[in-house]
Amino acid sequence: RKYDLKALKSPYVTELMEKLQENNIKICVCSNSEKARVINCLEELELTSYVTGVYGGTDCGHTKPDPFIYIQAMKDNNISPDETIVIEDSTAGIKAGVASGAYVIAYKDSYDIADQHEANVIVNNFIEAEKYIFSK
C-alpha cells in the first residue's frame, strides 16, 4: 500500500522524536507492514537513531487490530500499558492500542478518514501530540 508509514513523513516527527529521546522516552514503531519495510523507511527518513524497537505485524503473525504487536513491544522494553502512549492514524491501529491498555493518541491526517472515536484524544499534528505526551 502506498500510504503505509505515511505518519513517519509528517511534519514535526523528527523534532518530536528528538525531544522524546532527550527525555529518555523509548520509541518503538509498530506497523502492519513488514519489519524490513519499516526499517527501510526509517533509514530513508534518517530516524533510526531515535527508535528502540521496530515491530512488523506481518513478521510476527499478528496484525492490527490484534493488540499483540503493542503488547510485545511493551514486554520487550519492560514497560507497562499505563506507561505506554500509542500514536496511531488507522482504525485498526487505534483498536489495537486501546486493547493493549495503552493511552492512545489518534493522529488525524489528510489522506484517510479513519474512525478514531475510540482513541483517548485526537490530534491534528505532532505538535499537539507532544503536548499530550508530556502532560501525561
Where do the language-model regions lie?
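Short, acidic loop-to-helix structural element flanking the phosphoryl-transfer center
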Residues: R1-V29, K35, I39
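Asp-based, Mg2+/Mn2+-dependent phosphohydrolase catalytic module
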Residues: E18-Q21, K35-K136
